[in-house]
Amino acid sequence: MLIRVAALVALLTSLFGCTADSDAPPPSGRSMAMATAPGDVPASRWHAVLIAGDNNSPSFDNGIDALRDKLSARGVRDIRLLTSDPVRNPSAEVASASNVSSALRNANGAEACLAFITSHGTEAGVVLRQASGVVRPSALDNALDAGCGTLPTVVVVSACHSGVFLTPAMRQPNRVVLTAAAADRVSFGCGAGDRFTYYDQCLLQQFDAASTWGQLAQATRACVQNLEKSMGVRTPSQPQIFVGSAVANLRLPGR
């Protein structure tokens, strides 16, 4: 990320974070059967939904635009963008709760799913400012179940308090769930002068060198820890990682 403001200003801004103005068993009664333990899913068979939930910082739409470009370069064709800044991204859908749910549920013919959400967050979920809504963990889990079922599924939630998405229901064997912060922590880099959030910057920087989602998760977390330390952040965000047993070796598209 290119820090466009003086270091002291960036440090003071970071103190406010990105809040709005392990393997655990799956819940009983839910079928988790999978034909095989997946590793390499062809890039053309991924269904990707990239969501920028707030428009008071350019970092969120920058994040989905940059990840779209990386996925496209790897051969992913089924990419849906949802934005809270329709002036900037006029071809993208507005990030409303209903549009997010519809995009996630429409994975017909896919062999793997990716949901990437970057925004401000609260302990209730991720903010969708343009639609005055919130994506809650239960709603995300329901949409993923309906659209992706037992397909290999990667969920990246980049927001303050995003660790709230690591619920027992979300921790399914076919899912990788990465969050930018623990449930009781804020994340950083969402000011007006930031190009990317800290977490998004690190994920994008580490993307090309990683082979599996697990490798990318570990490298991204280490990058965030180093970046926060260099910026003098006193209360680190503590990015969280869950990799389900059925997708331990799931490779990035095109790797």
Where are these regions (language model features)?
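Solvent-exposed loop/turn segments at secondary-structure junctions
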Residues: 54-58, 78, 85-89, 119-125, ...
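Caspase-like cysteine protease fold
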Residues: 26-34, 39-41, 209-255
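Active-site-proximal C-terminal subdomain of hydrolase catalytic domains
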Residues: 154, 159-238
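Extracytoplasmic/secreted proteins, especially bacterial periplasmic and envelope-associated proteins
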Residues: 59-66, 70, 95, 99-102, ...
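A short, glycine/acidic-enriched catalytic loop
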Residues: 119-149
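Boundary/activation segment at the start of structured domains
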Residues: 4, 18-110, 191-195, 248-255
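Structural recognition of the beta-strand scaffold that forms the well-ordered cores
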Residues: 47-51, 79-83, 113-118, 153-158, ...
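Bacterial N-terminal signal peptides
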Residues: 5-15
